[in-house]
Amino acid sequence: MHPYRLSLTLTVVALVLAANVSAREPYEVTIENDVTMKTRDGITLHADVYRPKADGKFPVLLERTPYDKHMGVSFGLQAAARGYVYVIQDCRGRHTSGGDWYPFKYESQDGYDTVEWAAALPYANGKVGMVGGSYVGATQMLAAISAPPHLAGILPIATGSNYHENWTYQGGALTQLFDQVWTSGLAMDTLDRRVRKEPHRKPWQMVLPLAGFPVLVTGTSTGLADYYLDWLAHPRYDDYWKQWSIEEHFSKIQVPAIHVGAWYDIFQDGSLRNYLGIKAQGGNEAARNGQRLWVIVGGHAGAGPKIGDIDFGKDSVLVSAAK
């Protein structure tokens, strides 16, 4: 995680969760790998847990990711040393978790189930804050519209508000480069999972024409990203998209949030819309009054201070803020 995101995340979540971080910091850290939970429909999801090696109960930072939970080591160690339980979980159908991967589809129910599971861990104090950016921001927003009782706040960084416009399409045109690069990258894990399920190839399969290798020709779109075909089949903003559009469900969100966007981010519009939408339509006073927006100099991959040929200076990272 980029240093500005680490510092920002820990500062903001401390405020949102009202964490009582002990003067004994830094804590020694205990790591538990591949901690499992069951979703309401019986799917096993795997998480890594980083927590203070100390007695007592601590607030939870939860990150649900499609990009491999092992990427959370650095943040997990630092968060736990500062007095948080950090839980990073592979989303359904990704890496170590069970089930089938389909973007956005299960994040609301799986997010709810995971928040409630994390709040009940023996070393948790019952308060859960969700953190992370891009698709990990989407997992927060979709969990928030399901209103899990123990969700205390969210920190979505550089994420969308409508997964049709400004994610898959732009002004009615397919965002082809983003869609194809993103789905192709995600498909690599899907392919790996398929091969691992069928480790023993029949000898005759190995002498088929190269274009006929079964792993690569099962189903449409090679079976690796069939949701991409669904996106193409729904070029207009219809019920397919509305079911998981955050903009359709602002009134269901009941928690404070810090929305972090960047002036040169591909999802800048989403950060602004989420902030304004929940501030106006949030499900309770705490949500409506608890929205904050920070817009930084930077793009989707990180902060400035240099964008192209322009150097905005070392103090530019958090120069723009709104209440």
Language model: regions and residue ranges:
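Loop/turn elements at helix/coil->beta-strand transitions in domains of secreted/extracellular proteins
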Residues: I43-T44, K57-V60, R82-V85, A124-K127, ...
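N-terminal cap/lid segment of alpha/beta-hydrolase-fold proteins
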Residues: R24-G56
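Bacterial N-terminal signal peptides
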Residues: S7-A18
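C-terminal subdomain of alpha/beta-hydrolase-fold enzymes, centered on the catalytic histidine
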Residues: A233-K323
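Catalytic cores of eukaryotic secretory-pathway lumenal/extracellular enzymes that build
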Residues: I88, S97, G132, V136-Q140, ...
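Cap/lid segment of the alpha/beta-hydrolase catalytic domain
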Residues: P52-A120, N162, N166-Y169, G304-K314
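Alpha/beta-hydrolase fold nucleophile elbow
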Residues: P122-Y135
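Accessory cap/linker subdomain of secreted extracellular hydrolases
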Residues: A81, I145-K252
